[in-house]
Amino acid sequence: MILTYHTQGEVIFWQFQDYAPAEALSIGTQFSNVSCYSLEQTPYNSSFAGYKDWFIQNYIRPGYTIEVGRGTNPLPTSQFDKIYRDNLGILVLGALL
């Protein structure tokens, strides 16, 4: 499994075309539940360019891009505590899976 991080949107992208394995949706739902980020399929126009997409296609293993924070990049450091709290559960759960 791979977790990649970007800074924009408070959303988790989990799918790449039809390559993600069956358990990917269930794991993504768990990540969404512990973070309160929405779980969404990767928009077509955003596909084909990310490490997550390459990983899913080549290894047929779950992969997730987690978009943290809101606003104009670079995000202000004042968002750090919220981003940390929102993502701690994902990191712990990801390590246990």
Regions found by a protein language model. Give the residues of each.
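Metallocarboxypeptidase
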Residues: M1-L97
